[in-house]
């Protein structure tokens, strides 16, 4: 394991030296309130430029992303990020803007935001969108804030519950809890779909809404979605669409046509913008017309003289993000939508579904697939067979995949499947790449039967071997010891 950068520090080893300065020195304490002055110099590492470059290049070579290889992380839609989108976001007219510029000087940017909103409305079947939320979970929060504001505006103050399926993303109950809602779990039926009878039993005048992903986290389409919407609406609740799995229906079906009232998109999933450290993300929120007044302000509007920011929205929940959202991400997503168009988005969806079913079909002999039927963009396999017969867990299988050069799938989720392996291949993967993954998974299944210990100790070829995850969670070391308390 390489040293942390502090351990490489050498006194006097800095890489830059300032030329002599002919400006008279001042006493800092005479100009700055001593309360804001450091008593000691910060403990920063001292290294030459080449050592800093080598340190971070070495670390970067350990990273794994979609540009390195296959990344089948279920429910994360790790698709290729077209590099032309980066070019678009770096155009000087976008990259050099400042959010405090007057509206008349940023008409191009406002037009892009206006057009991006219209595209989102068309794709989602919604009437208005806000582009402010900075991530998927942030979009969830914004959407539930809108639902809460709607009920409060109607003086329907008894609606303090949010329904969440037992297969839902963990952010759904977490978001509802943050906003003070009581979370009520709705059971799945034997098909892996929302149990309509249980939903009906959960509905009441205290329910503000139901959060739903469609396709769900099993990769299955909620075929009774229209009846689900009817049940929720009949009792005065609203239907929220978590857009995490939009890639399974984009260009083919629209949440707004299914009865959803509020939704969020993940631009960093469905629309080809980077995830995580390559991001940031973006989670635009769309609503039907009767909820549009509650959207965060400002919204971009158009008049004869041009585009402008509309703050005159008395029912608005207010801003949920500084300025106007992660603008560069929106530029990239807009470029992606415009490049593919409607037919291209539909084809991308169809290829994602094809790839998912191709993997499911070829892995069904070696791995248990609890809901083994036509799926959408992802499916859930299970390591139950390997655990029962050979003592090899899903975690062992996932770690071993790293030795074969693949990022592991999502593991142990959804919670309703024991030893779950949630696999999402996305549309940008070739058949040849999928065949390589199938071969690796089959070889791991053989190893589980013939040499299970090799899986128990995996990974073997990575720089960092198997991490003690329990110890890392319970005894984290978050600071370099030289900086003080751990």
Curated annotation (Swiss-Prot):
Any one of the GO CC terms: cytosol
One function term, GO molecular function aspect: glycine binding
Listed InterPro entries: GcvPB, GDC-P_C, GDC-P_N, GDC_P, PyrdxlP-dep_Trfase, PyrdxlP-dep_Trfase_major, PyrdxlP-dep_Trfase_small
Modified residues (N6-(pyridoxal phosphate)lysine): 269
EC number: 1.4.4.2
Gene Ontology BP annotations: glycine decarboxylation via glycine cleavage system
Catalytic activities: N(6)-[(R)-lipoyl]-L-lysyl-[glycine-cleavage complex H protein] + glycine + H(+) = N(6)-[(R)-S(8)-aminomethyldihydrolipoyl]-L-lysyl-[glycine-cleavage complex H protein] + CO2
Keyword GTP-binding (UniProt): no
Cofactor: pyridoxal 5'-phosphate
Key words of the record: Oxidoreductase, Pyridoxal phosphate
Subunit structure: The glycine cleavage system is composed of four proteins: P, T, L and H. In this organism, the P 'protein' is a heterodimer of two subunits.
NCBIfam families: PRK04366.1 (NF003346)
Listed PANTHER family: GLYCINE DEHYDROGENASE (DECARBOXYLATING), MITOCHONDRIAL, GLYCINE DEHYDROGENASE, DECARBOXYLATING
Family membership noted in the UniProt record: Belongs to the GcvP family. C-terminal subunit subfamily.
Function: The glycine cleavage system catalyzes the degradation of glycine. The P protein binds the alpha-amino group of glycine through its pyridoxal phosphate cofactor; CO(2) is released and the remaining methylamine moiety is then transferred to the lipoamide cofactor of the H protein.
Name listed for the protein in its UniProt record: Probable glycine dehydrogenase (decarboxylating) subunit 2
Species name: Syntrophomonas wolfei subsp. wolfei (strain DSM 2245B / Goettingen)
């Amino acid at each position: 394991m390489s040293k942390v950068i502090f351990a490489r520090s050498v006194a006097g080893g800095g890489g830059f030296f300032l030329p002599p300065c002919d400006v008279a020195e001042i006493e800092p304490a005479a100009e700055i309130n001593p309360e804001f002055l450091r008593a000691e110099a910060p403990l920063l590492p001292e290294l030459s430029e080449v050592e800093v470059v080598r340190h971070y290049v070495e670390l970067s070579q350990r990273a794994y992303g979609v540009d390195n290889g296959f990344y089948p992380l279920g429910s994360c839609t790790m698709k290729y990020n077209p590099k032309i989108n980066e070019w678009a976001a770096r155009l000087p007219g976008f990259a050099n803007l400042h959010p405090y510029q007057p509206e008349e000087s940023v008409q191009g940017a406002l037009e892009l935001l206006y057009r991006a909103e219209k595209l989102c409305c068309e794709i989602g079947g919604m009437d208005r969108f806000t582009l402010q939320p900075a991530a998927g979970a942030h979009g969830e929060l914004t959407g539930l804030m809108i639902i809460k504001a709607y009920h409060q505006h109607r003086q329907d103050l008894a609606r303090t519950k949010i329904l969440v399926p037992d297969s839902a993303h963990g952010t759904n109950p977490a978001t509802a809890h943050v906003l003070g809602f009581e979370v009520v779990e709705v059971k799945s039926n034997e098909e892996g779909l929302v149990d309509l009878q249980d939903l009906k039993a959960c509905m009441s005048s205290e329910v503000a809404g139901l959060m739903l992903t469609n396709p769900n986290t099993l990769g299955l389409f909620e075929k009774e979605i229209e009846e689900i919407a009817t049940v929720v609406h009949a009792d005065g609740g609203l239907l929220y669409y978590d857009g995490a799995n939009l890639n399974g229906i984009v260009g083919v079906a629209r949440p707004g046509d299914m009865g959803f009232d509020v939704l969020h998109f993940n631009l960093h999933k469905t629309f080809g913008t980077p995830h995580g450290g390559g991001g940031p993300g973006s989670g635009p929120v769309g609503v039907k017309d009767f909820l549009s007044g509650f959207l965060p302000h400002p919204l971009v509007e158009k008049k004869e003289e041009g585009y402008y920011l509309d703050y005159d929205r008395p029912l608005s929940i207010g801003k949920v993000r500084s300025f106007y959202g992660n603008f560069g991400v929106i530029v990239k997503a807009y470029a992606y939508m415009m490049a593919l168009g409607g037919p291209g988005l539909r084809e991308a969806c169809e290829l994602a579904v094809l790839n998912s079913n191709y993997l499911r079909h070829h892995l069904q002999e070696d791995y248990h697939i609890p809901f083994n039927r036509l799926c959408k963009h992802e499916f859930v396999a299970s390591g139950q067979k390997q655990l029962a017969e050979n003592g090899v867990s899903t975690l062992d299988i996932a770690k071993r995949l790293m030795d074969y050069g693949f990022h592991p799938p999502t593991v142990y989720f959804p919670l309703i499947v024991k030893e779950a392996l949630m696999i999402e291949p996305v549309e940008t993967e070739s058949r040849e790449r999928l065949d390589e993954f199938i071969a690796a998974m089959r070889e791991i299944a053989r190893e589980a039967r013939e040499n299970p210990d090799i899986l128990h100790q995996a990974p073997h070829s990575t720089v960092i071997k198997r991490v003690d995850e329990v110890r890392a969670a319970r005894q984290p070391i978050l600071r370099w010891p030289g900086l003080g308390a751990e």
